[in-house]
Amino acid sequence: VAKMSGRGLGHTGGTLDKLESIKGFQIERSQEEFIKQVQDIGLSVIGQSDQLVKADKLLYALRDVTATVDTIPLIASSVMSKKIAAGADSILLDVTVGEGAFMKNLDDARALARTMVDLGKAVGRRTTAVITDMSQPLGTSIGNRLEILEALDILQGKGREDVTEFICELGQIMLGLANVEKTVKEVREHLFDGSALQKFEAMVVAQGGDLEDLYRPSSAKYVVEVTADEAGYISELPAMEFGLFAMRLGAGRAVKTDALDFETGIVFEKKVGESIEIGEIVAKVYANEKISQELVTEFKKNVKISNESKKVQEIIEVIA
């Protein structure tokens, strides 16, 4: 897996920011180092190189001033140009849809997914897109250090069942694209036998990360428990609202030049569809500045509770 990732902006998180919450982790690698690491251990995640698809930055700046940032053909060409230029033989695309995603409705998500898959196939790449739900946060954590800790739980087979199943399904699709036929059950076994965790640790070490720091809990000064004021079932946890809330804690950037606080964020104890009682913990908020009661009230307003349980389907559709 050779992956080039980006940074977060606004309510969206960035893979690079999360990895940089690990002490010493280097996201800048030369092309030679990147290729060698993938050959040696089979895995590397780095930042996007200025030497790759130089025209894309110019085109994005042009889109920004011509009201075409959300034009599907231009989004597709921007995303796929990087994947193709990086040399990937097989490409799995996660196209999110919903309140917290760039694509707000399923028709637009399908159109984007189909366009990118067709572009990949046109240049001889095995390409599949998965349309996934982003109406609520994926997993339980929002925030850089907190998301690394959740990922480590999953890699040790200790993650939430719904997220673990989702990741194993994506893993099966990725392996299929590489002509390795495995069942979801076989993929899951790698989480429980420790081999997936060992591979992640090998990447951290190869890119200068400190393994002791990797497992360190968040050092946020304040941890506030947000509790439910009514009983029922969680019906909404709007991903965008909570992403913006975490940004205000320092976990995200309002503008590209903002500094991040890696330790802050949110950990949900309950997700959509789950039952909750009065006084039960909905989430824990991690902050380095004291959290006001007004902020807690604002958080609670975004947690919707109803009388009926609601099922969330993480993978909505696969387009190949």
Q: What positions do the PLM features span?
A:
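Well-ordered secondary-structure scaffolds
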Residues: 68-75, 82-320
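Active-site cofactor/substrate anionic-group-binding motifs, chiefly glycine-
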Residues: 1-9
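Short gly/pro/ser/thr-enriched loop/turn and capping motifs at secondary-structure boundaries
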Residues: 8-12, 34, 52-53, 99-100, ...
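Glycine-rich tight-turn/loop motif centered on a GG-T
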Residues: 18-28, 62-69, 102-106
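Acidic/polar active-site rim loop that often engages polyanionic ligands
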Residues: 12-21, 55-63, 95-96
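Phosphate/diphosphate-binding glycine-rich loops and adjacent basic-rich segments that engage nucleotide
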Residues: 39-86
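Short beta-strand segments
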Residues: 4, 38, 46-49, 79, ...
